């Protein structure tokens, strides 16, 4: 999804409260975060059945600081128990190796309590 579609994702999550809905790429991907994106992501995250993948966010122009800002926003809105790692492989391989994606994500999420982010959330949702 793109930022302008996040309101629709929030509405979908509201209409189907018993269904876990997972948003890829924080609804942003390689785009730049702005007020429209943050408002839509916030509205989506307010639904208890809303989850997000921290994936597809690396680009040749996104800095470690920019990725860390996205991680802080995602953790604030979803907490680690509704947020999960995603490599975006094989698409990410066009610009970054898998090891680079993991390393950049670890730098962006240095928080000690990220077990849910790396494994718990995906295990709960997908078994």
Task: Show where each model-derived region lies.
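Divalent metal-coordination and catalytic microenvironments
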Residues: 25, 52, 88, 114, ...
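Tryptophan-centric aromatic hotspots in well-structured domains and transmembrane helices
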Residues: 37-42, 66-67, 89, 100-102, ...
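Mid-to-C-terminal alpha-helical segments outside catalytic/metal-binding sites
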Residues: 72-73, 77-84, 93-127
């Amino acid at each position: 999804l793109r930022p302008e579609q996040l309101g629709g994702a929030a509405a979908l999550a509201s209409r189907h409260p018993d269904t876990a809905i997972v948003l890829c790429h924080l609804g942003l991907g390689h785009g730049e975060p702005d007020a429209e994106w943050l408002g839509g992501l916030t509205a989506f995250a307010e639904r208890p059945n809303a989850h997000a993948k921290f994936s597809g966010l690396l680009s040749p122009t996104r800095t470690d600081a920019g990725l860390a800002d996205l991680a802080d926003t995602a953790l604030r809105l979803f907490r680690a128990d509704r947020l999960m790692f995603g490599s975006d492989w094989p698409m990410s391989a066009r610009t970054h190796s898998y090891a680079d994606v993991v390393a950049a994500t670890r730098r962006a999420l240095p928080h000690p309590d990220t077990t849910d982010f790396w494994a718990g959330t995906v295990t709960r949702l997908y078994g």
